[in-house]
Amino acid sequence: MNVAHSLSEKPVILCLHFSGGTWQAWHGIFPHFSADYSVIAPDMRGHGKSEKPESGYHIEEMADDIILLLNELGIECCHIIGSSMGAEVGLSIAASHPEMVQSLVCEGGLYDRWGEYSLLEGTKEEAEIERTELLASIYNEKELVYSSAEEYLSSMKGEFKEAKIWNRHTETFIRSTMEQKVNGHFANRFTKNVLAGFISSCWDIRLEDYYCKISCPVLFLPSQEESENRLAEKSIQHFSSLIREHYITYIPDSLHAYVWLQFPFQAADAVISFYKSFKSGRLSS
């Protein structure tokens, strides 16, 4: 497993990136934690420079990878910050190994993929149609290949500028997603097989089954869109009722998964305020 870390005697923060991400998704927030914390940021299974097996993309399998990594590094306990998929993996770790997790930040893991606590309104049969169509669209999507690194970066820059999240942190992240093929062309390291494997493995997961097993404080960090969605609000309220200590906040104009690149100072500040709140006993519950 490819991993970046700066270990010392300081408390440890483990950063778990979103689907399609790399450890460089956290590039913007590292400086905000370096004074008081050690930071570990791996490329999770199927991502970045880590191995890309054909299977094993259930959140519990990816959680097992991370637990092995922590054991190898001699980390007995840590704070976890998870983004989208990474939040679900972090949640799985907190549920199966509560003694290892001091706190959990969930910028993701806020709702199921279908069912009562999801953003899909409809029957199980309609949800299955949604899943089938989603997987078909992934498998049918043509891989984008570029003749040069500059062409790859230019294309990605256009997409990120359109989303209004282009900055030096996103540029560093985008460079980390690029790899050169045997034929000399450039493409994204993240493959559709990995994405489809993750969606297939995790479609029926009920996140409430994990939340009810954790014992650490949780910060829910929905995006602006999620904070304004009544179904997301319903789900977050239900999940928060299953845990002993929680806090809910959001950053204005934030985008799901990309807030750490988009507003690194505000995102890091939200996490640090959360840490101070539960240490002083002022955490909402």
Positions of the model-derived regions?
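Conserved hydrolase catalytic core segment
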Residues: 76-120
